């Protein structure tokens, strides 16, 4: 499924003694995905793929990935098809979708992780969509565990005002109009990551307007999935100031994973001396500087499997 090629020069992080290098991963759709490998100096027993949120480039996770590598974990970050350096055509011509991200991109990345770190235990850290789409991965059983951050159904009706009004405008007005006029959705204009391929944006809109997110597509555009088979342990982190992944929406997504043993932690940033974490700031080095216990939760979870 994957054909991995080194595409950049190796460099060693001065502070961490972490070898960081670029990788190109070919999916079974014959699409090239840009990726970065973080390799610690010692032998790797545990390796992690960081699956990104919708429209978020892999560089966003650099500090977090470096931190994990400093703690001895092998790490691989990547751009989904149509995002960042994995956009290889005019965006209006890109036919990527949320389904293709989960069914083709993420499995290819997991295969590449195994190629890079042989004889390790493999884990997935999912941010928002990166955790939602695991049930589309045919090789999900290679994962020993999952650590999800801000992962929920994103159901609009469960959001509080005024954020719900913003979400309704984005989903129900901007996406269909922009897709029709431009052939893609300029989500960056709303401060929501990179511009999105129209298929990604269209499915995002459809799924956030129904219960269970991806469950709304079962027996419609999705006829094969593994949500009722996945049984590896998972820790899901959420934060009380997250307008999207509120507690109700987290539970809505958790219910889709019918056999996954999930530990849910819904946390108040103020309990950690942090003013705000929301949907994105867990991965910020500034958050880690103020609340190191939060990143340590990921390390502790991953260590359980060693």
Features from the language model and the residues they span:
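Alpha/beta-hydrolase active-site loop
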Residues: 95-116
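Conserved alpha/beta-hydrolase
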Residues: 58-90
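N-terminal cap/lid segment of alpha/beta-hydrolase-fold proteins
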Residues: 2-39
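Alpha/beta-hydrolase-fold enzymes
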Residues: 125-212
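Active-site glycine-rich loops that stabilize anionic/oxyanionic intermediates
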Residues: 53-56
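Catalytic active-site module of serine/aspartate enzymes centered on a nucleophile-bearing elbow/loop
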Residues: 263, 267-306
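Short beta-strand/loop motif that positions the catalytic acidic residue
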Residues: 230, 236-238
């Amino acid at each position: 499924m994957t054909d991995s090629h080194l595409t950049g020069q190796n460099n060693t992080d001065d502070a961490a003694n972490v070898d960081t290098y670029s990788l190109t991963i070919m999916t079974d759709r014959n699409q090239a995905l840009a990726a970065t490998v973080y390799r610690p100096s010692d032998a790797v027993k545990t390796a992690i793929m960081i699956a990104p949120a919708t429209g978020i480039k892999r560089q966003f996770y650099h500090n977090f990935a470096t931190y994990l590598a400093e703690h001895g974990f092998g790490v691989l970050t990547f751009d989904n098809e149509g995002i960042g350096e994995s956009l290889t055509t005019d965006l209006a011509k890109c036919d990527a979708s949320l389904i293709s991200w989960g069914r083709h991109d993420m499995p290819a990345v997991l295969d590449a992780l195994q190629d890079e770190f042989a004889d390790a235990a493999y884990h997935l850290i999912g941010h928002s969509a990166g955790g939602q789409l695991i049930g589309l991965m045919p090789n999900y059983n290679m994962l020993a565990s999952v650590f999800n951050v801000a992962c929920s159904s994103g159901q609009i009706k469960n959001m509080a005002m005024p954020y719900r009004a913003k979400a309704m405008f984005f989903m129900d007005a901007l996406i269909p109009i922009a897709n029709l006029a431009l052939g893609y959705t300029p989500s960056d204009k709303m401060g929501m990551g990179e511009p999105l391929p129209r298929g990604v944006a269209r499915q995002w809109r459809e799924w956030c307007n129904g219960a269970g997110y991806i469950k709304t597509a079962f027996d419609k555009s999705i006829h094969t999935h593994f949500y009722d088979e996945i049984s590896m342990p998972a820790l899901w982190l959420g934060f009380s100031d997250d307008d999207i992944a509120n507690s109700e929406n987290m539970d809505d997504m958790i219910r889709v994973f019918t056999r996954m043993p999930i530990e849910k932690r819904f946390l108040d940033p103020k309990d950690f001396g942090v003013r705000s974490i929301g949907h994105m700031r867990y991965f910020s080095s500034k958050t880690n500087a103020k609340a190191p216990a939060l990143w340590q939760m990921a390390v502790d979870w991953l260590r359980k499997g060693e």
